[in-house]
């Protein structure tokens, strides 16, 4: 059963999953203030450094609150113009990296569809501390299957909609991305599509996450991966300045 999201759940998740970053940042601030007793910092330089640290800590939380708590992302209403005939969507696969906040919502929007949830997380290959923590608190959709990113247990040409919602960037290797997307391509039915939502490694996300934007990948990287996987279309729609929705068809 779908659970109602708590107020500020998105930003609280960011704090929880990335707490190592915030512990380090706060520790660095304490050291900087303490250093004033040992080093004669010029005031302008000191406050520029402090402001930069505070910006790096606060900006990601503000943007995350906007995107995940106030933008309507989890309503999935943005799917409506991408799926013009929901009655034809019989089979859906929602693929995540072990943190699944969307399968129950997708099922509520497509109640007559056969929805399968796959988890491609591999502890040896996907080593980010945040995703390890996220997996521990994720609500698991019934019968979620653990899968290998390069070998999805799907029959050729049988899936109407593949959803990759804020998960595919956890595949760090470009070759693994291509192999994974080839599997998505293979499984798509005639008229089927892949819908992927991602932050990008672009200027907007640099302003939001500073060096943390390197956790994401550029539009050109994703375009190359989809094209090399055999997809013929790669259409982008912006959802807030910080997220992109990609609609890709074989």
Over which residues does each language-model region extend?
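Class I SAM-dependent methyltransferase Rossmann-like catalytic core
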Residues: 2, 8-27, 33-86
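A short acidic, amphipathic alpha-helical/loop segment
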Residues: 78, 102-109, 179, 183
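Short conserved AdoMet
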Residues: 87, 111, 172, 189
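Class I SAM-dependent methyltransferase SAM/SAH-binding core
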Residues: 91-94, 98-151
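A short acidic, Gly/Pro-enriched loop at the edge of an enzyme's catalytic core
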Residues: 149-162
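A short glycine-rich, Lys/Arg-flanked "PGG" loop and its adjoining helix->strand segment in the class I
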Residues: 177-193
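C-terminal alpha-helical "lid/dimerization" subdomain adjacent to the S-adenosyl-L-methionine
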Residues: 193-247
């Amino acid at each position: 059963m779908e659970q109602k999201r708590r107020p500020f759940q998105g930003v609280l998740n960011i704090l929880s999953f990335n707490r190592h970053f915030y512990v380090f940042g706060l520790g660095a601030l304490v050291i900087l203030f303490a250093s004033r007793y040992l080093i004669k910092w010029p005031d302008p330089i000191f406050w520029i450094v402090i402001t930069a640290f505070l910006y790096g800590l606060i900006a990601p939380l503000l943007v995350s609150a906007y995107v995940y708590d106030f933008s309507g992302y989890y309503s999935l209403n943005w799917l409506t113009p991408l799926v013009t005939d929901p009655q034809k969507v019989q089979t859906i696969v929602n693929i995540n990296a072990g943190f699944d906040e969307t399968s129950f919502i997708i099922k509520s929007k497509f109640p007559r569809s056969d929805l399968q949830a796959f988890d491609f997380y591999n502890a040896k290959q996907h080593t980010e501390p945040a995703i390890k923590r996220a997996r521990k608190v994720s609500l698991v959709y019934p019968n979620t299957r653990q899968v290998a990113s390069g070998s999805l247990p799907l029959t050729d040409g049988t899936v109407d909609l593949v959803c990759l919602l804020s998960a595919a960037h956890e595949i760090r290797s470009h070759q693994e991305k291509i192999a994974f997307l080839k599997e998505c391509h293979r499984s798509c039915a005639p008229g089927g599509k892949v819908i992927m939502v991602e932050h990008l490694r672009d200027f907007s996300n640099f302003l939001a996450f500073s060096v943390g934007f390197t956790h994401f990948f550029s539009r050109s990287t994703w375009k190359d991966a989809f094209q090399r996987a055999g997809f013929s279309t790669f259409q982008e729609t912006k959802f807030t300045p910080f997220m992109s929705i990609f609609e890709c068809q074989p």
